[in-house]
Design a protein with these regions (language model features):
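Conserved ABC transporter NBD signature motif
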Residues: 59-71, 319-333
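Conserved ABC ATPase signature
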Residues: 139-143, 147, 385-389, 393
Length: 403
C-alpha cells in the first residue's frame, strides 16, 4: 500500500513549477492508478516520491511522509526501495546502465549481490514473461524506441517489486509499441502489482485504470472512476488540458491551406549512417508545399528523425533539396532550419530560462526577455534551470525560444 500523509514538496526554494502541496492519498495493494494533468502540474514529483528519487536524489523542501507498506520512503535507503518499487521513465535510455540487453536485465540483481544461479533464473523467467527472446544479446543502441521500452519494463521487474511506477512511458512510442506496453501493464495488473502511472496519452489505459487522479497546480484536484472520466464532455476535458480517454472521441483540427505556390522539392534524397549499410532514407523525388504544417508519420525506426536531420542540414550528404527553385546545401539549411529534438535536454545549455532566451536574441535587455517569456506563459520560470522543467515544458520552452 502507498500512503501519502499531507505531503508537500518544492524543488530548491521554488514554490511552484512541478512541486506538490498537501497531498493526502492512499493507493491500495494491487490498485492501478492513473495520474493525469497538464505539464508541470506535479505528476512526476508524485512518482518520484514513491520510488524514492525524492528526497534521496532530487533535493528540495519536503513536508509530510510517504509510506510504502508502512515504511517511510525518506528513511528507507534507495537500494532497499529498488527491490520494492520498479520504475519506467519517459526516455528508457535514461535508465540504461549497460550496452547490451543481457547485462541490463542482470544489472539490478548483480547490484544487490544476488547469487548467479538466482540471477539467471530471474532473467529466464522475465524473458519468457515478456516475450523478448528476440531482443536478448542485442546492443541497446540498436533497439527501436519500443524495444528499448520493453527492455526497460523487463529490467525494472526482474527484482519482482510489488509496486511499479511509470512516468509517461508511451511518449516516444508508435501505435504497435504502445500496444506492447499495454500488454505489459495488463500482465502486471494480473500479477497483482500496484501500478502508478503518470500519462498524457490516455486511450491505451482504457479498461486498465481503477482510478484517475487529476492533478493541477501541485494538488490532486479531482478523482474519477474510469466511467466518470470517460463521460467528461469535450469542453470540460479541453478546459482541463487533457486528451480523450478513447480514440473514438478524437476530432480533426481545423484545416488550413497556405496561399502560396512555393514548393520544397526533394531529388535523390537518400542517406545511410554508415557505408555498406542499407539506406535509412530513400526518397527518389517528392514535393511539399511551403508554409503548411506537415506531419511526418511512421513506425519507430522508419526514418522520420533521419528525414528531419537531413532537412535541417545536420546530415551533409543526403541529396538535393530546393525551395522555390533555389538549391539549399547543408550549410544554408542549418541557417534557415530549427529542430526540436525528441529529448530537448540535449538542446538546453545555460543555467536559467532567461539565459537560454538571451542565447537566441541579439538584444541583452532582460525586459525584452520578460516580454518574450510572458507571451508564452513562461515568465514564472525565468530563474529556473531549464533542465528542471517538466518533460512537457522543455520542448514548449525550446520551441518558443527558437522562434
Amino acid at each position: 500500500m502507498i500512503d501519502f500523509q499531507n505531503v508537500s514538496f518544492s524543488y530548491g526554494e521554488e514554490s511552484s513549477g512541478g512541486g506538490i502541496r498537501n497531498v493526502n492519498l492512499t493507493i491500495n495493494t494491487g490498485e492501478f492508478v492513473l495520474l493525469t494533468g497538464e505539464s508541470g502540474c506535479g505528476k512526476t514529483t508524485i512518482t518520484r516520491l514513491v520510488n524514492g528519487l525524492v528526497p534521496h536524489y532530487y533535493e528540495g523542501n519536503l513536508e509530510g511522509d510517504v509510506l510504502l507498506d508502512g515504511k517511510s520512503v525518506s528513511d528507507t535507503p534507495l537500494y532497499d526501495l529498488a527491490a520494492m518499487v520498479g520504475s519506467v521513465f519517459q526516455n528508457p535510455k535514461s535508465q540504461f546502465f549497460n550496452v547490451d540487453t543481457d547485462s541490463e536485465l542482470a544489472f539490478a540483481c548483480e547490484n544487490l549481490g544476488y547469487p548467479q544461479e538466482d540471477i539467471l533464473k530471474r532473467i529466464d523467467r522475465t524473458v519468457s514473461d515478456y516475450h523478448i527472446e528476440d531482443l536478448m544479446g542485442r546492443s541497446v543502441f540498436a533497439l527501436s524506441g519500443g524495444e528499448k521500452q520493453k527492455i526497460a519494463c523487463a529490467s525494472s521487474s526482474v527484482l519482482l517489486p510489488g509496486i511499479m511506477v511509470l512516468d509517461e512511458p508511451s511518449s516516444n512510442l508508435d501505435m504497435a509499441a504502445i500496444d506492447d506496453l499495454r500488454q505489459v501493464l495488463s500482465l502486471w495488473k494480473k500479477q497483482g502489482k500496484t501500478i502508478l502511472i503518470a500519462e498524457h496519452r490516455l486511450y491505451y489505459l482504457h479498461d486498465l485504470a481503477d482510478r484517475v487522479l487529476y492533478v493541477k497546480d501541485g494538488e490532486i484536484e479531482r478523482e474519477y472512476t474510469p466511467a466518470e472520466f470517460d463521460s467528461l464532455s469535450d469542453g470540460t476535458r479541453k478546459e482541463m488540458g487533457l486528451r480523450p480517454f478513447s480514440l473514438s472521441k478524437l476530432k480533426p483540427a481545423n484545416q488550413y491551406q497556405a496561399h502560396t505556390a512555393k514548393q520544397m522539392e526533394f531529388q535523390n534524397f537518400c542517406f545511410a549512417y554508415k557505408k555498406r549499410e542499407p539506406e535509412s532514407l530513400h526518397i527518389p523525388s517528392a514535393e511539399l508545399p511551403v508554409g503548411e504544417t506537415i506531419a511526418i508519420i511512421g513506425l519507430n525506426g522508419a526514418g522520420k528523425s533521419t528525414l528531419a536531420r537531413c532537412i535541417c542540414g545536420l546530415e551533409k550528404k543526403c541529396g538535393l533539396l530546393q525551395v522555390d527553385g533555389k538549391t539549399l546545401d547543408w550549410k544554408a539549411r542549418l541557417k534557415h532550419c530549427y529542430m526540436v529534438m525528441q529529448d530537448t535536454s540535449h538542446q538546453l545549455f545555460t543555467e536559467s530560462v532567461t539565459d537560454e532566451v538571451l542565447l537566441s536574441i541579439d538584444n541583452e535587455d532582460e525586459t525584452v526577455v520578460d516580454k518574450i517569456l510572458k507571451q508564452f506563459d513562461l515568465l514564472e520560470y525565468k530563474d529556473r534551470h531549464p533542465l528542471s522543467l517538466s518533460g512537457g515544458q522543455k520542448p514548449v520552452s525550446y520551441t518558443h525560444l527558437t522562434l
